[in-house]
């Protein structure tokens, strides 16, 4: 980020900041001879804390809010998108994300609850008039129970994926959620932290075997007698043929992390091999 200077009492902000703030009035929340913290006035929830990720790790932030039983919203501005985690008495109860792959429709698709054409149709049907979830329920594509389970999976994925970021900025506001927005997650915040850290480490190990989500899983013909039922279903999907590992992750319905783990185990045992995706020759002259 380029340096900012106050010239004749005027501070010129970067265009990106101006687009975010708009014409809302600002107030100085904190200042010293080394920093100046400005806050938009008249918004819901007061700013309690702000800083840069990297100087403060995600795990330390989440542990702090959990230890001191904080309630509010932690907004993280990251490379490629934003995430907001909502706390109630120190526990994460909801989360939102602007990352496309963490949208509820993509979560439902990733869990194998609908296909791409149905998802696109539901998005057009919703078209700003209603939420995508309500549109899918109204169309009979999913049940309320399906949507609740997918939303819980979505929130946990948003949290788990947050641990992969080492840079960005954060701000914590004392914004409260409405009661009907509060989710009961499958694990408390401390367990989410431990699981998130574990997944970052283990996913890197699994990907060493899988190599790429664009690679094609192929059955080798070897079928051990001691495969559990989940591994057998995974192998059956591979035997029927999938375009690539990414499609296998979606069709398994087990979620990305667990599917990568199972696929990695099948590769390690020689049951599945990964082949490079074939290259496609494009005819013609570039630019035509």
Describe these PLM feature segments.
Residues 1-288:
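Acidic, Ser/Thr/Pro-enriched low-complexity segments and adjacent helix/loop capping patches
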């Amino acid at each position: 980020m380029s340096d900012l200077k106050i010239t004749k009492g005027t501070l010129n902000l970067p265009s990106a900041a101006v687009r975010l703030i708009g014409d809302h009035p600002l107030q100085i929340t904190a200042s010293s001879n080394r920093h100046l913290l400005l806050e938009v006035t008249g918004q819901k929830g007061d700013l309690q804390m702000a800083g840069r990720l990297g100087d403060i790790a995600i795990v330390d932030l989440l542990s702090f809010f959990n230890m001191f039983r904080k309630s509010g919203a932690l907004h993280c501005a990251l490379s490629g998108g934003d995430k907001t985690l909502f706390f109630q008495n120190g526990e994460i109860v909801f989360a939102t994300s602007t990352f496309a792959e963490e949208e509820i429709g993509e979560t439902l698709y990733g869990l194998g609850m609908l296909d791409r054409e149905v998802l696109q149709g539901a998005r057009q049907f919703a078209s700003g008039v209603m939420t995508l979830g309500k549109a899918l329920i109204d169309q009979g594509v999913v049940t309320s129970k399906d949507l609740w389970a997918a939303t819980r999976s979505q929130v946990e994925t948003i949290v788990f994926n947050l641990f992969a970021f080492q840079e960005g900025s954060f701000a914590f506001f004392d914004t409260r959620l409405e009661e009907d927005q509060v989710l009961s997650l499958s694990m408390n915040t401390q367990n989410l932290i431990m699981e998130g850290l574990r997944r970052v480490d283990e996913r890197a190990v699994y990907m060493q075997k899988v190599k790429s989500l664009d690679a094609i899983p192929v059955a080798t013909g070897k079928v051990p007698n001691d495969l559990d039922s989940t591994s057998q279903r995974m192998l059956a999907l591979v035997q029927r043929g999938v375009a690539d590992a990414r499609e296998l992750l979606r069709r398994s319905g087990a979620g990305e992390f667990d599917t990568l783990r199972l696929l990695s185990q099948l590769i390690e045992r020689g049951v599945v091999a990964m082949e490079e995706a074939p290259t496609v020759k494009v005819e013609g002259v570039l630019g035509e």
